[in-house]
Amino acid sequence: MARFTLHDLAATVDARAASGGESSYTKKLLDKGPEHCAKKFGEEAVEMVIAAVENDRGHLISETADVLFHMLVLLKSRGVKLEEVEAALAQRTSMSGLEEKASRKRD
């Protein structure tokens, strides 16, 4: 079985976002706007946390897959590419975690 990556999933999200199909769950989410996508992402994140707290490995894996999907949909809704997130991660990993945290802008 070929390895399925986040890039594969991002490409699927992109393709479904561009489709005119009413049967696409991805398209329906995006059509409802970024706020809806953010809310759905939050719901899935909470479900993932609950699965982790309950120590339910199978459920945690399933909910994590949902979180990753909804994260990519949310990013798409705001025009952010996975590669931009990867660049931010690469920049952060070039220094220690404490240095990186100290370098962040404060609100």
From Swiss-Prot:
Chief location bin: cytoplasm
Enzymatic reactions: 1-(5-phospho-beta-D-ribosyl)-ATP + H2O = 1-(5-phospho-beta-D-ribosyl)-5'-AMP + diphosphate + H(+)
Subcellular location: Cytoplasm
UniProt GO molecular function: ATP binding; phosphoribosyl-ATP diphosphatase activity
GO cellular component, one term: cytoplasm
Similarity comment: Belongs to the PRA-PH family.
NCBIfam families: histidine_hisI, PRK00400.1-3, PRK00400.1-5
Alphabetized PANTHER family for the sequence: HISTIDINE BIOSYNTHESIS BIFUNCTIONAL PROTEIN (PTHR42945), HISTIDINE BIOSYNTHESIS BIFUNCTIONAL PROTEIN HIS7 (PTHR42945:SF1)
Pathway terms, separated by semicolons: Amino-acid biosynthesis; L-histidine biosynthesis; L-histidine from 5-phospho-alpha-D-ribose 1-diphosphate: step 2/9
Catalytic activity, EC: 3.6.1.31
Coiled coil: none
Signal sequence annotation: none
InterPro entries assigned to the protein according to its UniProt record, in alphabetical order: HisE, PRib-ATP_PPHydrolase-like
The keyword Cytoplasm is annotated on this UniProt entry: yes
Alphabetical keyword list: Amino-acid biosynthesis, ATP-binding, Cytoplasm, Histidine biosynthesis, Hydrolase, Nucleotide-binding
Species in which this protein is naturally found: Rhodopseudomonas palustris (strain ATCC BAA-98 / CGA009)
Superkingdom of the source species: Bacteria
Biological processes, Gene Ontology terms: L-histidine biosynthetic process
Protein name: Phosphoribosyl-ATP pyrophosphatase 1
